[in-house]
């Protein structure tokens, strides 16, 4: 099976779907002020045609209700600028392209469009037709839009996914050189970490180059993705997954060869690596860069119905929080896990993820490290 066929969130609306388990809204709270500033500066710059039709691409939109959280924030930010101007100019039409891989569950996304349009008219007074939303399926590591056609590109929690598993993780004899690991983790040897960094450098450079061509001069890009910060020792979702798969091997429920042959195309860069790649590629100016961390159980509600939870308030809360974390991790990685290990292993794996999540939460290290970076396309010399 081709890698891109399983590189998507768990679709549908079931208990293990991404739509039911994502805590995306909690992360957007941190991103929203930077998003608003990007939109405001774009509109005030009077770029070509922006006051007639504001063109936006959301790269890696995933599926479910969370897809429209960013769209709503973008629309509200645009309209906020119009209100501040206090003039009679009509608000620009907004054209938004939702992008993800072809296997993304776009059906569940567009089933929500009618209610989104109704809420938009109710909350923002925008008539249907003044905000146009469509799909642009395909890899965001390839061309998606015509040259100099877009004003703003946004991507949230996607760019840590690589275009492919790095080369060099298996010898010519088919022996894994990343034993016991599923990505470039702290336990990986330096050559493995370099292979993942090289692949990220190649992919992120391609991403910047291609999408700089799609943006108009001085167009903006806002990116948020997981990162690693040396001063914090926060195991991320991949670390939880790696620990839990190793537990299954130790307990005899999974063959070691299955673990050693499982390499996930994910890399969490440092902020220094991100800055270096942006500067070396050269198309963008870094306007803003911030790191933050959010708790594993962001979005958790004690009212959520997790089966089998204890009746003791304290242990019940701990069990439910850990179960919530396991559900989120499963909703992200289930397609690629099922493809490699088979679906039968998923319930046991989820149980072990919850156990490991509970340990990390008790240790006070249950946080995801993230980076927000705001970029502006450098103007051509003729535009300066």
Curated annotation (Swiss-Prot):
Gene3D superfamilies per record: Methyltransferase, alpha-helical capping domain (1.10.1200.270), Vaccinia Virus protein VP39 (3.40.50.150)
UniProt keyword terms in alphabetical order: Alkaloid metabolism, Magnesium, Metal-binding, Methyltransferase, S-adenosyl-L-methionine, Transferase
Disulfide linkage: none
EC number annotated for this UniProt entry: 2.1.1.160
Annotated metabolic or biological route of this protein: Alkaloid biosynthesis
Tissue: Mainly expressed in leaves and fruits (grains). Also present, at lower levels, in roots, stamens and pistils.
Cofactor descriptive note: Binds 1 Mg(2+) ion per subunit.
Any one GO molecular-function label of the UniProt entry: metal ion binding
UniProt site (Involved in substrate discrimination): 154, 266, 328, 343
Enzyme class: transferase
Domain of life of the source: Eukaryota
Binding site residues for Mg(2+): 178, 260, 262-263
Cofactor(s) named in the record: Mg(2+)
Catalytic reaction annotation: theobromine + S-adenosyl-L-methionine = caffeine + S-adenosyl-L-homocysteine + H(+); 1,7-dimethylxanthine + S-adenosyl-L-methionine = caffeine + S-adenosyl-L-homocysteine + H(+); 7-methylxanthine + S-adenosyl-L-methionine = theobromine + S-adenosyl-L-homocysteine + H(+)
Pfam families: Methyltransf_7
Biological role stated in the UniProt entry: Involved in the biosynthesis of caffeine. Catalyzes the conversion of 7-methylxanthine to caffeine, likely via theobromine as an intermediate.
Protein family according to the UniProt entry: Belongs to the methyltransferase superfamily. Type-7 methyltransferase family.
Protein name, per record: 3,7-dimethylxanthine N-methyltransferase
């Amino acid at each position: 099976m081709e890698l891109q066929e399983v590189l998507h969130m768990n679709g549908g609306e079931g208990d293990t779907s991404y739509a039911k388990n994502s805590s995306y809204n909690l992360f957007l709270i941190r991103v929203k002020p930077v998003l608003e500033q990007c939109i405001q500066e774009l509109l005030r710059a009077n770029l070509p045609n922006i006051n007639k039709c504001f063109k936006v691409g959301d790269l890696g939109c995933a599926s479910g209700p969370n897809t429209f959280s960013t769209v709503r924030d973008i629309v509200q930010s645009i309209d906020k600028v119009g209100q501040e101007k206090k003039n009679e100019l009509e608000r620009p039409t907004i054209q938004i392209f939702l992008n993800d891989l072809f296997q993304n569950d776009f059906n569940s996304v567009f089933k929500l469009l009618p209610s989104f349009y109704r809420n938009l008219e109710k909350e923002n007074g925008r008539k249907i037709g003044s905000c146009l939303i469509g799909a642009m399926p395909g890899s965001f590591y390839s061309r998606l839009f015509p040259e100099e056609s877009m004003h703003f590109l946004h991507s949230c929690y996607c760019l840590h996914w690589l275009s492919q598993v790095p080369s060099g993780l298996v010898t010519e004899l088919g022996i894994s050189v990343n034993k016991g690991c599923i990505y470039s983790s702290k336990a990986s040897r330096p050559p493995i970490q370099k292979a993942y960094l090289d692949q990220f450098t190649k992919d992120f450079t391609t991403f910047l180059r291609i999408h700089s061509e799609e943006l108009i001069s001085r167009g903006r890009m806002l990116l948020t993705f997981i990162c690693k910060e040396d001063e914090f020792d926060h195991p991320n979702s991949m670390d939880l997954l790696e620990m839990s798969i190793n537990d299954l091997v130790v307990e005899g429920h999974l063959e070691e060869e299955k673990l050693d042959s499982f390499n996930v195309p994910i890399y969490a860069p440092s902020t220094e690596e991100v800055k270096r790649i942006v500067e070396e590629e050269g198309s963008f100016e870094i306007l803003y860069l911030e790191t933050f961390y959010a708790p594993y159980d962001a979005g958790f509600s004690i009212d959520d119905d997790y089966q089998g939870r204890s009746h003791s308030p304290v242990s019940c809360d701990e069990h439910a929080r850990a179960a919530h974390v396991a559900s989120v991790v499963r909703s992200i990685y289930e397609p690629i896990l099922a493809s490699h290990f088979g679906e039968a292993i998923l319930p046991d794996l989820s149980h072990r993820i919850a156990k490991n999540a509970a340990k990390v939460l008790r240790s006070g290290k249950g946080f995801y490290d993230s980076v927000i970076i705001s970029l502006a396309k450098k103007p051509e010399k003729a535009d300066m």
